[in-house]
């Protein structure tokens, strides 16, 4: 396998094969990448992603949206990314209609999410699309999630901000 160093050197992944060797028919493809993804310019990867664009669902978690944008797959489409990187995405790829607030966005068969936890919300939406709301709730329960969040919910939580303010006033 191919060794892939995780962000910050904390995790190492072993890939079974290089993306260019992956073939076959896929129903759904979900990209989950690290922060370095924002500067990736790889023609072979862009070509492979264009081949994958015909799947029923193509998704990108957090900064993986940059890979879809680089491949031209987000041109004219609505998309999101983590709140820290939305402006950068919009500046680098002005043809993408970047939405800065939602947790995740669906535009046609392409889904983008704001961050890792928003990626969980997106994955649960896919489970609901395929298997119904009951199984999606069961999966959320197994993951010990406090609640399931719809895609249109804001990235920056008012509840979290209130909680942080309350904690600061206690100290």
For the regions a language model picked out, list residue spans one by one.
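Extended, subdomain-level signal for the structured scaffold at the beginning of enzyme domains
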Residues: 1-58, 66-70, 100, 128, ...
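Short, surface-exposed amphipathic charged segments that create phosphate/polyanion-binding patches used
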Residues: 9-14, 94, 113-114
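A conserved active-site-flanking secondary-structure segment within enzyme catalytic domains
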Residues: 75-103, 138-139
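Short beta-strand and adjoining strand-loop segment in the mid-core
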Residues: 68-83, 110, 127
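Predominant activation on well-ordered alpha-helical scaffold segments within soluble catalytic domains
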Residues: 50, 90, 120-124
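Conserved anion/nucleotide-ligand pocket segment
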Residues: 103-142
């Amino acid at each position: 396998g191919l060794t892939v160093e995780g962000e910050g050197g904390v995790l190492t992944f072993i890939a079974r094969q290089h993306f260019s060797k992956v073939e076959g028919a896929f129903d759904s493809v979900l990209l989950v990448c690290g922060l370095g993804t924002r500067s990736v310019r790889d023609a072979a990867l862009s070509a492979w992603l264009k081949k994958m664009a015909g799947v029923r669902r193509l998704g990108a978690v957090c900064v993986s949206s940059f890979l879809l944008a680089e491949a031209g797959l987000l041109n004219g489409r609505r998309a999101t990314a983590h709140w820290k990187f939305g402006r950068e995405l919009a500046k680098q790829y002005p043809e993408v209609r970047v939405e800065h607030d939602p947790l995740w966005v669906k535009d046609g068969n392409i889904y983008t999410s704001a961050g890792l936890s928003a990626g969980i919300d997106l994955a649960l939406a896919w489970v609901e699309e395929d298997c119904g709301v009951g199984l999606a709730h069961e999966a959320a329960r197994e993951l010990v999630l406090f609640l399931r969040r719809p895609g249109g919910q804001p990235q920056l939580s008012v509840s979290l901000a209130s909680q942080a303010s309350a904690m600061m006033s206690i100290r």
